[in-house]
Amino acid sequence: MEAIIAIAIFTIGIAGFTLLFSKTWQGNSYTYELGKASFAASQGVSKVVGYVRKARQGDDGSYPVRSAADNDLVIFSDYDKDGITERLHFYRSGSQFLMGYRKPSPGLPKTYATGDEATVVIAENVVNEAGVPIFYYYNSGYPEDTENNPVATPANVWDVRLVQILIKVNILKGREDDNVPLSSFVEIRNLSDYDRIGS
């Protein structure tokens, strides 16, 4: 009888240890995967910051910022450093943050066809809630002018001088408390230089 009780206690102990180990492993696995996803998204956002910072006039003479909405931004920038200015289209589609690009026509005058030529994934597992856009835009009065900043969207492209990028990343829906926010402010260098020259 004592042997049966000892075996039962031992079995319960093993089952408890196995359950504890399993839960710990699942928790660590989730943390590790979320960390990987956040790191990859952070690298993608850093690239976007560089492209936006170096926005410039399109090869067809277009203003550096083509359109500026909550989850959609179109600028001109030489993203692949080949001396040719591409039209870059940053937008959210489902849980992905994407960049579409389009090179200008080879002949003269230069033109940009409609639509994106190709698309690159900037970040995955994006979980921004409704009412939390990816892009916020600020005019030249920021940070002193907090009443008119961030500017209303879709923004008047002539007003945009500073862009805030905010994405929230999570590998599991329904765990909003674990969302990892990644935020960065970027000044459009060519436009701020223009403000200094014009003043």
Functional labels for PLM-detected ranges:
Residues E33, K81, V127-S199:
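Short linear sequence signals and composition-biased patches located at protein termini or domain-edge surfaces
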Residues G27, G58-D59, R175, R196:
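Generic macromolecular interface patches on structured domains
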Residues P64, R87-H89, F185:
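Short, surface-exposed charged micro-motifs
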Residues Q43-S67, D82:
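Alpha-helix exit/C-cap motif
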Residues A68-N148:
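Type IV pilin-like appendage domain
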Residues S67-A68, V160:
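A generic fold-level signal
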Residues M1-K54, I197:
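Aliphatic-rich helix starts adjacent to a transmembrane/signal segment
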